[in-house]
Amino acid sequence: MVTQNDYVLSIEGLTVSFDGFKAVDDLNLYVDKNEIRVVIGPNGAGKTTVLDLICGKTKATEGSIRFNNMELTNMREHEIVRAGVGRKFQNPTIYENLTVFENLEVSYPKGRTVMGSLFFHRTGEVSEKIRDIAAQILLSDQLDTVAGLLSHGQKQWLEIGMLLIQDPELLMLDEPVAGMSAKEREQTGELLKRICENRSVVVIEHDMDFVKSIAHRVTVLHQGKILKEGSMETVQNDPAVIEVYLGH
């Protein structure tokens, strides 16, 4: 039997209300170590709100969010990041005028800030870490490329790399393959499978073929509640899921 202490992420009784409307309603969600959990559901189901609650952008009305048994609900966003939770939003937030190498360097936790770059002393350790991450995100041959010149898919990978260099134990991604080519989607799937060997990944996604290729478990949200949870096959064949989501 798995206890709460064994989960990387343990959410219990989570509720958030906006002007009386419950965007998330008494949610219970448990994510294992090294798991890729995909959250799906119709627009307005509460998917992005759940990520906002986990990373501290939105505060819960009720309930508990525990990461490695650490309560997050009263922590600030930067404290949650430092604890080991990384969050990628739908649109890439990279420094378009910096090179790929510089984007990763700026993100290095003991590296430099954009304003403090004049005082930063680049070490061999930093350079080695950057090259390792670049290899993981398929950008080894683009380290000197200005980020604004990358393809849409490469920009998404770069932002994932900017999170990975901070070594989070939980990585949350909001629609990571939106706008990508078929080949980029396939490469992104392989990337996520690689990185979950050392961390847990929570993904919001609408592309069902992509979900099928990466998900260990799928959680279906509807009106702020869990409608169904299980393998992709279980979810796909559930009449209620077909009615509210997959049938549309």
Predicted segment positions?
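Helix-to-loop junction immediately C-terminal to a conserved catalytic motif
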Residues: 55
